[in-house]
Amino acid sequence: FFRANLYESNLQGANFEKTNFTSANLTRANFTGASLIEANFQNANLVEANFTSANLTGSRFEGANLNNAKWTDGRLCEAGSIGECK
């Protein structure tokens, strides 16, 4: 999924272990309950993505835009969240 455009995709409950989402457009993607173990989200656009209850163990987010994304614990990432949910 390198550089893929998955804008508003419903990926709920999917298994994406070790998947490469580098530089992908995942704006408003729904990853609720997904298995994303060791997934690579480097430089991905994850604005308003939903990671509620997703497993992100070992996943990489360097340079990823997480503005207003919903994190695994349900909190919203603040504006300016690049590389990590703040």
What is the predicted role of each segment?
Residues F1-K86:
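Tandem repeat scaffolds
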